[in-house]
């Protein structure tokens, strides 16, 4: 069952940290895009509670694909993710969240493949994410995972963010 898989994963993570001991290294646990895998936001948060060295890695495209689209229609839908993490793990986890972002094609089972920002069929859109980051004064690390256009799409995000903040869009 899913509950048994969660118990086993948390036990494994605890044993890992017993073996590793105290370390300055943070270990990321990522949200997943396929519905039959562990990796909902709630599951990742529970896994991160095993040890303070574990930090959530939120892939917004994965969460959108898991929910078969439409998960992030506006700024507030992104803000809820950051607020949930802050409430359950602490503000520092949310403020400096490590994120992945791309649009993702999906089926009823979840993630199928990463696509580019040019894709008009699949989401999510990045603009509301940038607005959420600005309004809540967050400082996340965002890795763009677009298929074949990572640099171009990452630059589009950066430009949008800077323009919204009133900075030069270099």
Residue ranges and their predicted role:
Residues 27, 59-60, 99, 142:
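Conserved, mostly hydrophobic/aromatic
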Residues 151-167:
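C-terminal helical cap(s) of enzyme catalytic domains, especially alpha/beta-barrels
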Residues 18-24, 49-53, 89-93, 135-137, ...:
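Short helix-capping segments at alpha-helix termini
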Residues 10-17, 41-48, 79-86, 126-130, ...:
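Generic structural signal for well-ordered alpha-helices
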Residues 31-35, 60-64, 103-105, 148-150:
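Active-site-proximal loop/turn and secondary-structure-junction residues that shape catalytic pockets
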Residues 38-41, 64-139:
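Gly/Pro-rich active-site loop or hairpin
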Residues 1-58:
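Active-site acidic/histidine proton-transfer and metal-coordination neighborhood
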Residues 142-152:
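A short, acidic, flexible beta-alpha connecting loop/helix-capping segment that sits on the rim
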């Amino acid at each position: 069952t899913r509950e048994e898989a969660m118990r086993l994963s948390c036990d494994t993570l605890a044993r890992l940290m017993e073996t590793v001991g105290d370390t300055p290294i943070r270990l990321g646990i990522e949200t997943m895009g396929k519905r039959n895998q562990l990796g909902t936001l709630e599951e990742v948060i529970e896994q991160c509670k095993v040890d303070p060295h574990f930090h959530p890695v939120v892939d917004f495209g994965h969460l959108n694909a898991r929910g078969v689209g439409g998960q992030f229609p506006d700024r507030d839908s992104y803000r809820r993710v950051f607020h949930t993490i802050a409430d359950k793990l602490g503000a520092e986890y949310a403020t400096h969240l490590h994120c992945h972002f791309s649009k993702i094609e999906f089926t009823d089972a979840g993630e199928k493949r990463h696509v580019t920002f040019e894709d008009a069929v699949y989401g999510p859109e990045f603009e509301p994410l940038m607005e959420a980051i600005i309004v809540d004064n967050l400082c996340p690390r965002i890795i763009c995972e677009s298929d074949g256009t990572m640099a171009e799409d990452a630059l589009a995000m950066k430009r949008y963010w800077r323009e919204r903040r009133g900075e030069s869009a270099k």
